[in-house]
Amino acid sequence: AGINFTRRYFPKLFSFLGEFEYENSGNIKLGTAEGGKKIRLLGVNHLDRYKNNRAYLDEYYLKTIHHEFVHIVNQTKDYPREFGKVTPNDYVNDSWSSSKYGTGFEQRGFVTAYSQKEEREDIAEVVSTYIISTPAQWNAILAKAVIKDDKGNAAKEQPGVTAINKKLEICKRYYKESFGIDLDKVRDAVIERENDVVSGNYNLTNLN
């Protein structure tokens, strides 16, 4: 994205809290974005325990940072309204964490259960999930979206796959046209750096 993008959009303040927070619903809160300028990252007391486990590092920290940064970007330059028209009737607010919506969300066109909460969380989940996922991991999400008949054959119509692909296409276009950013190149860089962190082979003096 370049230094000018970083200077303009990167959060000016990071706030780190030792423990995670919990909402009244019992759902864990991993972070927040505030006013286009600040990101609060929670649970940093547990970072040493999770930093060498890619799955936990993704779920609790890296995806959270990227998710909240999407909110920062959206607060600065709004995303296309067509995104919300892909699955307009399938957002369920706080019910996303109930057992009814905890599985099968891919077939409804969502990449995570949390995506079902509301439109702005959906776009943040699509972008953050995509850029931390290897091609194989992303394809696994799409595979879960495939609807099959009783014989295990894929149905002719695949609304979940179509919706996820459409949302990703909108996100890629939004970042490219608004900021000149190629999300595929971002993903390559994120995965490379994450591999360095997990392996313990990172150098903060060379981030080119």
Where are these regions (language model features)?
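Zn2+-dependent metallopeptidase catalytic core
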Residues: 1-17
